[in-house]
Amino acid sequence: MIRGIGIDIVEVNRISDMVDKWGERFLNKVYTPYEVNYCKFKSNTYECLAGRFAAKEAFVKMLGTGFKHIYFKDIEVRSDEKGKPYLRIKGNADRLTKESGIKRIHLSISHERKFAIAFVVGEEG
């Protein structure tokens, strides 16, 4: 049974502007080293980062909590061997997920030159 859904769309330029303005400070606040490294070697680095930002926003919308007591880096977007994205969560994000009865999290990310979008579904049992 579905316990929550979340969706978010991000302008790629918003992320590239933040990286240009704040550099490592922004990257280190929002992304894990894995995420930065993964996106750094992509030809579409900013689209990749924007997709991960959208996924984090969609996740907290799915939980219904927003970022209250959750850090961006508590939500990590990883990719399996086929490139399919999935979430690795920790800290308060993990605790709140468990308290909500969510056992499985599904993630889809799409991006193009101007926008990135992410959709998250939380499922019980």
UniProtKB/Swiss-Prot annotation:
Obligatory cofactor(s): Mg(2+)
Protein localization: Cytoplasm
Pfam families assigned: ACPS
Keywords for this protein: Cytoplasm, Fatty acid biosynthesis, Fatty acid metabolism, Lipid biosynthesis, Lipid metabolism, Magnesium, Metal-binding, Transferase
Class in the EC hierarchy, top level: transferase
Physiological role: Transfers the 4'-phosphopantetheine moiety from coenzyme A to a Ser of acyl-carrier-protein.
Name the record gives this protein: Holo-[acyl-carrier-protein] synthase
Native source species: Halothermothrix orenii (strain H 168 / OCM 544 / DSM 9562)
Gene from which this protein is expressed: acpS
